[in-house]
Amino acid sequence: MGAYGVVYTAVDIHTNIPYAVKALNKIGLEPRQRKFQQREIQLHHQASAHPNVVSLVKIMDAPDCTYVVIEYCPEGDLFSNITEQGKYVGNDDLIKRAFLQILDAVEYCHSIGIYHRDLKPENVLVTDQGMTCKLADFGLATTDHVTSDFGCGSTFYMSPGRSRCQHCRESSANPSRMSNIVTQGLLLLCFSA
């Protein structure tokens, strides 16, 4: 999962509760890459107070790897629930419920100064037979209101401001909040796929 790690399923032997464990490799990373990992963990931790953000439970640091223990969502991501399982097809009430949860999570993140920058169905996890959606993967998140980062995120869900051509990039900045708002509209379109 992601550029720096893989995700495993683990079960707490004392409580029998399943968790997802994201293993972030530290070996061979440049300082800049390690800084990105630390930022991802920090911002996810701050945002996980919201019920529609995947809870970050614990961080365990080893010499070669950082293990991030997060809430386990066995139903997978929104993308597979839409495209493979057809869970939302023709169910306007379920679509509305799910989309409002995503909006609420993103608005909460914005209210505490976090901008996700990679909103897409693959980064929204689903529980409760599709009734609950939770924002995940803060690998590209930032606290910068305006950023000069263009082209970060996933191409199919990228706002026009983030996908500008090279000569446009030199002349203007990209408002992080507005990019997330445009992408929310694209997420809504995915429900009708």
Regions found by a protein language model. Give the residues of each.
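Conserved N-lobe ATP-binding subsite of Hanks-type protein kinase domains
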Residues: 6
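Conserved N-lobe beta3->alphaC-helix segment of eukaryotic protein kinase catalytic domains
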Residues: 18, 24-48
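A conserved loop-to-beta-strand element in the N-lobe of protein kinase catalytic cores
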Residues: 54, 63-71, 79-80
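A short, aromatic-enriched beta-strand patch in the conserved N-lobe beta-sheet
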Residues: 58-59
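AlphaC helix of the protein kinase catalytic domain
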Residues: 79-89
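Activation segment signature within eukaryotic-like protein kinase domains
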Residues: 98-99
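Catalytic-loop of the protein kinase fold
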Residues: 110-126
